[in-house]
């Protein structure tokens, strides 16, 4: 992976919230927003064109390549339209129910498309899958299921996966006589030892808020299993007030009370390189972060990345209901289809290319890790084969891959969710306050 990959991952995966903040529902205006042609799902019928709308960033090189491949053999031609990343979600909402709507569009699955499903704008892909089972079977199930809503499939993975891993500074651990923690108790012990040596145990970009959320996602999964969050997301507000929720919050408080993150983590950010620098310079031993941490370190601290950057799965919790192989993070990005497309057969043919060898090799070439079953055949060609293999095995073996909470919920829930987790970590609200805040989130 390279510096470009770091920007791609932290951009398309995390920065959607700036675009979403002012866009809490569907805006049914008539403003065109596509970056190339002004066609649409409805107006392109006679011209034999399908419009593919994507998040505008450097990853578009692969998307353009795949569109060009499709156009070599298809009578119906595909046109790639882009919206600059910072404007993507808001402008998509503006055009999604207008004549300027695309046939196919980029999204994050989960909550990012739930409002469109609710408004009956998307085409379930189940009929396409019945005709071509490969549209489902050629993808890792834990990833594909992120775009399944109410039992129907609404998306095909189209970029790379981004699991959250526990990164470490191998030199710091060795000097402290510690090894990578396998269990929660191991982690708590490591925190105490590192604190005693004057080292901040865990780097945390609390100023960004979303890095803190990763701790909640894993602890809740390890302790309660994935069903607690699934029930909450489905509208069962009592899930947050159950015994398992209380235990998970107790574990998180145990971590903060032990001083695991130091005293000023809310003034540190990942996005400006602050928390990665703490890890690289040996001022912290661990950082829980998405897989883009690796390429971030390769870019900013190449010697550290080459020699001393370690990574592992999140520790298990003794007696917990969650499988130690469960993963959280950003499962992938997806292509979804507008119900009013005039060329569903052409769209189906286009989507088939998302599991082609060409697609896999092209994504690996820019530092992404595709989630197709044939990806394993090409991992040796990636920029960091060992790291890619570790991630792929982790995702492939995961019984559950929980999409980040702030992406599983609809966009309007992101800010109150981030505020709730920050206040709990800061000690400004107790468990009851956190539970009340989570029960107040809108899941529609």
Q: What spans do the regions from the language model cover?
A:
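Conserved N-terminal structural module of periplasmic/extracytoplasmic solute-binding proteins
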Residues: 2-114, 119, 131-134, 362, ...
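Short helix-initiation/N-cap motifs at beta->coil->alpha
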Residues: 82-91, 110-111, 184-189, 265-280
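Hinge/lid segment of periplasmic solute-binding proteins
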Residues: 110-164, 188
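Short, solvent-exposed loop/beta-turn-alpha elements that line the ligand-binding surface or hinge
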Residues: 126-139, 206, 223-247, 300-304, ...
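Extracytoplasmic/periplasmic solute-binding protein
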Residues: 154-158, 164, 188-241
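Glycine-centered hinge/linker elements that transmit conformational signals in sensory
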Residues: 193, 234-266
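Extracytoplasmic/periplasmic substrate-recognition and gating elements
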Residues: 258-261, 301-366
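C-terminal capping/gating helix-and-loop segments adjacent to ligand/active sites or protein-protein/ligand interfaces
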Residues: 369-376, 388-442
